[in-house]
Amino acid sequence: MHRYRSHTCGELRASDVGTDVRLSGWLHNRRDLGGILFIDLRDHYGLVQLVARPGTPGNDALAKLTKETVVRIDGKVSARGADNVNPELPTGEIEIEVTEVEVLGEAGPLPFTINTEDGVNEERRLEYRFLDLRRERMHRNIMLRSAVIASIRSKMVALGFNEMATPILTATSPEGARDFVVPSRLNPGKFYALPQAPQQFKQLLMISGFDRYFQIAPCFRDEDARADRSPGEFYQLDVEMSFVEQEDVFQPIEKLMTELFTEFGNGREVTSPFPRIPFRESMLKYGNDKPDLRAKLELVDISDVFADSGFKAFAGKHVRALPVPDTAGQSRKFFDGLGEYAVEHGAKGLAWVRVGEDGTLAGPIAKFLTETDVKTLTERLSLVPGHAVFFGAGEFDEVSKIMSAVRVEAAKRAGHFEEGVFRFCWIVDFPMYEKDEETGKIDFSHNPFSMPQGGLADLEEKDPLDILAWQYDIVCNGIELSSGAIRNHEPELMLKAFEIAGYDRETVEHEFAGMLRAFRLGAPPHGGIAPGVDRIVMLLADEPNIRETIAFPLNGNAQDLMMGAPTELDESRLRELNIQLRKPVAAKGANAPEKTAEK
């Protein structure tokens, strides 16, 4: 018999009754019923019940051991009595009569329990992540991640893509978030950067003559944590294709996502084909560029209705309305509760009216609306008895942010929200540039390597804020899974694009020397995308936080509490790297959000 096991803990069934077995695993739980010990033994594959009767070697040994001790046991498979069968356990029809026990790894006092999902704070869980990963939910999430990545690889190869690796040590670049830098011992005073994304390398592969590239790529960004973004390191399905237009990129990715979410979605519906929603339409209808289409409500811009209104709360402001069917009969508590939710998201309040059976409007602001206002709103919003309407007024960005949150919450509270589905969409026609309202500076709104839709003519003739890029996002259930773009592969066009964003020719020629050199030696039209693997798994696992799907994530302050990283270097190491430290100074705007190349 094998030194440690003849079977795994999850594979024994009623057909194995009478078999002598050897198992190894962790002591998951123990119950003492009149001196008879019932032990749940756990390994990677499942759980099985052990029985150790009084006076047996197994009973004496197991009685002294703590939970999570690793043991090897010998015993015989026996059938459980009919009253003791556990139908929720694959091994629930059998148990193991223990004859021998060997301790392989004793466990001391545990910092938290493993066999329950109790309220242990995240910092504690990350400090003892190896224990946290023993929990059933976490173990299942990591195994789901493994299966998803394996499936992605298989499907990408079937779609005609080739997996290729790109460098981890590369050069820093001016676009995107902050780099993680690595000092070069052999080149004093110089630094490598860990790649924020393999952006330039995957484009260079297309210029090298390869046609369809993919990689499960590690990416590194020195940015703040969010629920859907882990600081430090993350993984993306990096994709690039030659001789393609936008729809050519959409087709294989849409097929991949549909098949992947169907395979691992546990019966949840996957909507296909994915609708294409222009960026500006998304901002107006949903309040953001990552709409949760499970919420079956849309915002309506009614700013013109109140442009010259006597109602000061709305007059001259950007005003967005949210009509909600079948809600007028809700209690005042419903309306007040949604108002409180809006305040929590930055609003000063939430104006509303409801439509009565006779078509008249009632509510806190009804008395401020003229007959013309009522008629226009009724027509514009297609109001009928039973409707309620919620209003947000103020600056465009502020109203968009608040009302996007209210839209989803109102849908959930009023019964207009779909459960058990994955609602995908493409967001297209992104603006190429944006203006910093404080400095007045024009900068790239997203990916600086995107092709402007009108080419060089647009860059030379149009207002930069009116230029659209061949850039797109794929969104699912309000989570942005990826950005992508058709690339700007023409040198002069690229230089002009950067010039508009304030980069002089010399800087661009220096920072992107490799790219420009390649573009000048025969570059094909190409484009790509990079869906986030961590976010895909987060959605499939139905987890609210991305760190629940990563084996060893950093905490919100980009610290590894288990390994103690980041660490200080001793003076000898610093001298070897030609580095001298100075007292840290808080950087102005250190926590400001950063643009990113692709996600």
Curated annotation (Swiss-Prot):
Keywords tagged on the record: Aminoacyl-tRNA synthetase, ATP-binding, Cytoplasm, Ligase, Nucleotide-binding, Protein biosynthesis
Subunit structure: Homodimer.
Taxonomy, superkingdom: Bacteria
GO biological process, one term: aspartyl-tRNA aminoacylation
EC code(s) of this entry: 6.1.1.12
An annotated GO cellular component: cytoplasm
Protein localization: Cytoplasm
Molecular function, one GO term: ATP binding
Protein name from the UniProt record: Aspartate--tRNA ligase
Annotated stretches, region: Aspartate: 199-202
Substrates-to-products reaction catalysed: tRNA(Asp) + L-aspartate + ATP = L-aspartyl-tRNA(Asp) + AMP + diphosphate
Residue sites binding ATP per the record: 221-223, 480, 532-535
Binding residues annotated for L-aspartate, in chain numbering: 175, 221, 446, 487
Pfam families in UniProt: GAD, tRNA-synt_2, tRNA_anti-codon
